[in-house]
């Protein structure tokens, strides 16, 4: 079977990237259904959310850089097989135990896929602009469409508890078959020894020395954006139903969709801007958006909350893209799987840990006070990210000026003759 042209393969990988994230968000609108059906507590619901993140982080920490050694396609194939198996568990789930198993398996598969998919996207990108667009837009599009489509199906479709998983299962099966014609973008170099293999699979975050400064400077931006995404996906449904009185699953999903849809649209329009411009727009927009959203919650004004979600979603995309642009530019091709896996370790820790804490705290201090505390935390991370962005820009400007001065100071070569 002839391999696809790299440009076509790029779009197939982009679709897979979005589909993995779509599947990761799809169970969210079903959690209230499971809770009502099986009668488990809010703490158990938090555990269901946490087990997915924990297994995904374990996968990122162990097999995140595996594709740099064995090639991209084998890792993606195994991840898709595991994702299909997790969808089967969701379909047959009749109790919390099976639901936990399904979410845990999905976490393992998603962790194996994310760093590899990002690396493959960059490997195959027709241009840096298009690659940056997909890397920035895929999380927003995947998460937004997963929540929205699942919410509509839960509210209006037959067999609402299983239909979304059956659809995802079929799409993953099709993508697994299509993977056969995707060209390999990373030469299989294997491992020098068993010790090398064991060291690669040992749980750790690995960032090459030459990337470390840029990576660490980008972490606050990653934390700010993904923490806010975790807030929307973990407590967003509760805010919409308890604060604004929206009980329709489809409408609730559409309201949550606004945040991620605006992030996706912003990614399309801002992708060719320099990372400094993205940060200069994204960080203030992110801060303004969360403040407006909080004002909507406190005033119980749904229109104000939606406006805040629009502004915050736009800032989310620009901020995340700025961080990813900086990291991508600093990362050698042979280490993309390793570095991007580390990116998602930081991102998903930020996505999950505050959300889990909020899920525990909300029963003690109430939803509004929890949201106030969460927004304060996000704003603090935005301030830290802005400080790092300004510092890095000043260093870059100083380096360019010093280089120009050194060049000007060089004596002109004497003319011969």
Go through each PLM region and give its residues:
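Helix-breaking motifs and short loop linkers at transmembrane-helix boundaries and internal kinks
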Residues: 39, 71, 92-97, 158, ...
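Conserved MFS/SLC helix-loop-helix module at the cytosolic interface between two early adjacent transmembrane helices
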Residues: 57-96
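Cytoplasmic helix-loop-helix junction between adjacent transmembrane helices
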Residues: 102-139
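Helix-loop-helix hairpin linking two adjacent transmembrane segments in secondary transporters
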Residues: 133-180
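Symmetry-related core transmembrane helices of the 12-TM Major Facilitator Superfamily/SLC fold
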Residues: 163-180, 371-389
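Transmembrane alpha-helices of Major Facilitator/SLC transporters
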Residues: 251-275, 285, 289
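C-terminal transmembrane helical hairpin of 12-TM major facilitator-type secondary transporters
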Residues: 278-321
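A late C-terminal transmembrane helix in Major Facilitator Superfamily
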Residues: 316, 324-370, 374-375, 385
